[in-house]
């Protein structure tokens, strides 16, 4: 198939055509077990019947009406998010980048309205990832993503992740917000320590700064709780969500307390497609399935099984030195001898019929459906073991 798309993506050699649950079939009819979940998006697997029904019902009612009006699906999903989190208000958009852009803009506007123009600095983490807009790619602490787009937005300070002393040194009266991923996703599935996030909360309180948690990847059940902050004994001021929020239908959301959200008066921010009725109808139905004790317990149980199985593969193949993460968001850290070869290993896995991800050059990422069953897990692990064994046997590394 000829490619008419811009070359900013390196496409895999297969073309997915249809999918159901945790199984995908390409244009040649070959089957794959999906351990990637569309990069932590397909939280209920592919084409979940309840989501198909929700989308089908809404598409016969209302597609788009603009944010001159509100709609029942948008209000219903917002109510569910508010009722099950710290937040009082929700801003809907289309992606994680847009959710983080809104969060950062809100933080700066809130600080300006309340404290004047001198309180605008944003503190973020090295190796973080918050999106691809010019603002969010600048806040993300990875120069490889931002260096080609200078001059970049200013007033951003980066500190090492999980380095409490560096965070304490950086946050001050000039700080309007600290933004942190509870688990750094793109940089290796690296969880924040409880002490680090609790220190961030304390510093923000001390200096009248806002704590923004980027839960684009960790939210909506991936860690075994609805939101990852629930593991840490803290509450943010602003939270970003996307990916699994729509389970494959594009939607993002920024959640905030009423006091902070009040800084966004009419005209201060917006989104043409934010709160789209179809997206919110799908998101609302997905929320009902994800936010249940049965689903969240299943995530914790299956996550433990998958982590144990991956550790077993580590012992058998010698490719990994560590498995880390929470729930069904896991990363396998490559052994020193195989560092930098994560992409080669994911390609080898694909040839054996299993879809996995990279998280940087040294980590294999797993973000399967939250409904992953034992049969699909076992078959995926069987295929993965064949791929890893073959890779280790034919690799140039000792």
UniProtKB/Swiss-Prot annotation:
Catalytic activity, EC: 2.6.1.11
Co-factor binding comment: Binds 1 pyridoxal phosphate per subunit.
Keywords: Amino-acid biosynthesis, Aminotransferase, Arginine biosynthesis, Cytoplasm, Pyridoxal phosphate, Transferase
Entry GO terms, CC: cytoplasm
Binding site for N(2)-acetyl-L-ornithine: 132, 271
Superkingdom, taxonomy of origin: Bacteria
Binding site for pyridoxal 5'-phosphate: 129, 214-217, 272
Listed GO biological process terms: L-arginine biosynthetic process
Signal peptide feature range: none
Pathway terms, separated by semicolons: Amino-acid biosynthesis; L-arginine biosynthesis; N(2)-acetyl-L-ornithine from L-glutamate: step 4/4
Chief localization: cytoplasm
Record-linked CDD domains: OAT_like
Enzyme class: transferase
Reaction catalyzed: N(2)-acetyl-L-ornithine + 2-oxoglutarate = N-acetyl-L-glutamate 5-semialdehyde + L-glutamate
Residues modified as N6-(pyridoxal phosphate)lysine: 243
Cofactor list: pyridoxal 5'-phosphate
Similarity-based family: Belongs to the class-III pyridoxal-phosphate-dependent aminotransferase family. ArgD subfamily.
Something else known: May also have succinyldiaminopimelate aminotransferase activity, thus carrying out the corresponding step in lysine biosynthesis.
Protein's recorded name: Acetylornithine aminotransferase
Species the sequence originates in: Neisseria meningitidis serogroup B (strain ATCC BAA-335 / MC58)
């Amino acid at each position: 198939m000829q490619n008419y798309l811009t070359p900013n993506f390196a496409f895999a050699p297969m073309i997915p055509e249809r999918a159901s649950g945790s199984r995908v079939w390409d244009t040649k009819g070959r089957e794959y077990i999906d351990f990637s979940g569309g990069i932590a998006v397909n939280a209920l697997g592919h084409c979940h019947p309840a989501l198909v029904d929700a989308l089908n019902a809404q598409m016969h009612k209302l597609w788009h009406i603009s944010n001159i009006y509100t709609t029942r699906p948008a209000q219903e999903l917002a109510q569910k998010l508010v009722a099950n989190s710290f937040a009082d208000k929700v801003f809907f958009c289309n992606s994680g980048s847009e959710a983080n852009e809104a969060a950062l803009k809100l933080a700066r506007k809130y600080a300006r309205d309340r404290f004047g123009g001198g309180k605008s600095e944003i503190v973020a983490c090295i190796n973080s990832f918050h999106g691809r807009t010019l603002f969010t790619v600048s806040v993300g602490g990875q120069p490889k993503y931002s260096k080609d787009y200078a001059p970049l937005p200013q007033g951003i300070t980066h500190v090492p992740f999980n380095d409490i002393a560096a965070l304490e040194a950086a946050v001050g009266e000039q700080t309007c917000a600290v933004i942190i991923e509870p688990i750094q996703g793109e940089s290796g599935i690296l969880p924040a320590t409880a002490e680090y996030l609790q220190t961030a909360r304390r510093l923000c309180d001390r200096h009248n700064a806002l704590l923004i948690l980027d839960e684009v990847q960790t939210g909506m059940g991936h860690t075994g709780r609805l939101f990852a902050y629930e593991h840490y004994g803290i509450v943010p001021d602003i939270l970003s969500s996307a990916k699994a929020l729509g389970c494959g239908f594009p939607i993002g959301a920024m959640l905030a307390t009423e006091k902070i959200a009040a800084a966004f008066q009419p005209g201060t921010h917006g989104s043409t497609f934010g709160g789209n009725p179809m997206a919110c109808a799908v998101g609302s139905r997905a929320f009902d399935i994800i936010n249940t004790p049965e689903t969240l317990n299943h995530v914790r149980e299956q996550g433990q099984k998958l982590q144990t199985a991956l550790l077993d593969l580590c012992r058998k193949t010698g490719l990994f030195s560590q498995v880390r993460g929470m729930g069904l968001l896991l990363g396998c850290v490559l052994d020193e001898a195989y560092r930098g070869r994560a992409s080669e290993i994911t390609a080898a896995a694909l040839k054996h019929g299993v879809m996995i991800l990279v998280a940087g050059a040294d980590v294999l990422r797993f973000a399967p459906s939250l409904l992953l069953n034992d049969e699909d897990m076992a078959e995926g692990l069987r295929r993965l073991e064949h791929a890893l064994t073959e890779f280790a046997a034919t690799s140039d590394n000792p």
